[in-house]
């Protein structure tokens, strides 16, 4: 041998930071992570949620990104052409607040942070393709936000209407959410109670896609996300019923229980309902107006709180129950929300808990119309919301309530006062923001032509550099005459631009498409590249985005399909939600709490690979938990010891039996493969640690060729987790650059067959011991082995064994009483 790999290693020594800096330079110089476009390989578009450029990457960013990077590397080594881009979600309120605090422009603060974070992302050792980077505050990006707005507008999916905002009657201005303070919702500037006021706002008509958004058949997403979206969309089947209010006209309600109509003994409208002012009698006017003002100061969350006392006032008006012709009083009450249903309800106190509480308080009749089981006809002590026989319901008496819903709806339809209906809790997406640092909405207002969209050829409508962005509660662009005053693109006359900017969730609803061609000028993305890469194969990100970003991006994709931009229905085929790494105090990391953990001190002390591996080792990725650096030294020791496998002396020249080394190596490859497929990074690293110990124990007992082959496989499966260490050790081994361009090792099923397995033994679901058992052991023998353990016997002696739960080859649970 010309030179052993141990001698090559000894010349360099072990310096993780020097190793990492050297290989990061080499990777950049050789373009190692430039996206492979080889069409003969299967595609894998891996995407992690783009970060907000807040200044520095904290440990939470590392926790989100390094496992995603590890899996993308794994897929690349398995023979996929992998697209793994990164960008920055750069518009938004934090930039304005930081700029105000520091007295600088939001643009300067944002781009300075982006530059710093780029370097930190490279230091992390990721395989991001930075050539695909997008920055959402760049005009070449937000131009296409505006283009999408125009397309939505053409399709009737973007519209303007009055929507409630927080308003300070003393300052005579709207307030941003953060300017409303305290439990009683007061203006932070003047301490005046804040009210709700309707102002013209722009919305996207996501409700047009509500039904389709309930279809998850084409995607593999966590059940919890799907459940959250189903609940957010809130589909309900029932009936719309028209009640006549005396002296006013018809008001429609939606109910899921038309079978209870005969029990409606009062009627309730939300404080914001447009009928309130008209139906209120003069003698009730002052009380009703005061109540409406109080309700306007409350949040919808508070109003919907089921534990809160139900309040309301009589309007003086009466409605007519269409089922029996009875006059019933009309109340205004804040437990009815304008945003759900029609903003009016038929109140059936016997069969609705909120209505029951309200009726008790106001002395309103509570009439049972669905008989509970064994009901004796006496008044109900609490609302009965279950099924039963219809009673006190005229021609429907004796009808089962489930059947009665359909029959009553049909009866109402025949009479022209009702119809079957589907209702959704989902509201249209309000995209107007009265802030500066966002995408200008491409609309102008002309006295002659009305609302006029900006022509596509005039995009982008640029955000002015010299705007005053100090918060006033109104759109900062409103005070910039140079921006606001313009010509009507239709008639050439004087006009004014829309001065609201777009919700930043618009930016992140389609960014995965722009990554494909960040500088493409003919459309939002290059369709040719789109045909090669879309849709996203694997998305990773937090579950906190379930009902906003993850819903909005699905909506956007469906609209893009209907615009002919894509030929599929869903943006991301598979989704994995990682947990949240919390601050040392157990709270989510944030600069305002002062609990952000800066990873730089750990990188400086141990290197990036150690921090990467530690974050993946501390527990299941989908669980997260508080940051605790207590175990990081152990991970550092492991990688240092792993390095000695190629640096700590030569191996034997003897030809030893390679059987056990080969078997263990093949088992390692299979285990790590399966763990990575299932996002079980912690167990994969545990397997690598265990195998490292074994290799150190047998080093010197096998021949060089067998050792080299075992080391090749070990380094290949180590590479996605500790890319710098694996690259360094691969070179020391004498292999060609780069380990990350090698194929993933395979395994022989004959060699991975276990002769023995370790059974976890539980008693009543609690871990009591582990026992060795022959592979393929049956339940009876497994029970015998479990009961042979002294630890297990201590928990079962003198107790009756009632049941055995056996997971073959893995676990046995003895259920005793």
Swiss-Prot record:
Gene Ontology MF term list: aminoacyl-tRNA deacylase activity; ATP binding; leucine-tRNA ligase activity
Places the protein is found: Cytoplasm
Any single Pfam family the record assigns to this protein: Anticodon_1
Record-listed ATP binding positions: 591
GO CC, alphabetical: cytosol
Reactions the enzyme catalyzes: tRNA(Leu) + L-leucine + ATP = L-leucyl-tRNA(Leu) + AMP + diphosphate
'HIGH' region (motif): residue ranges: 51-61
Enzyme class: ligase
Alphabetical keyword list: Aminoacyl-tRNA synthetase, ATP-binding, Cytoplasm, Ligase, Nucleotide-binding, Protein biosynthesis
'KMSKS' region (motif): residue ranges: 588-592
Keyword Protein transport included in the entry's annotation: no
Enzyme Commission identifier(s): 6.1.1.4
One annotated GO biological process: leucyl-tRNA aminoacylation
Family assignment from sequence similarity: Belongs to the class-I aminoacyl-tRNA synthetase family.
NCBIfam families in the cross-refs: leuS_bact (TIGR00396)
HAMAP family given in the database record: Leu_tRNA_synth_B (MF_00049_B)
Entries under PANTHER family matching the protein: LEUCINE--TRNA LIGASE, MITOCHONDRIAL, LEUCYL-TRNA SYNTHETASE
Protein name as catalogued: Leucine--tRNA ligase
Protein species of origin: Rubrobacter xylanophilus (strain DSM 9941 / JCM 11954 / NBRC 16129 / PRD-1)
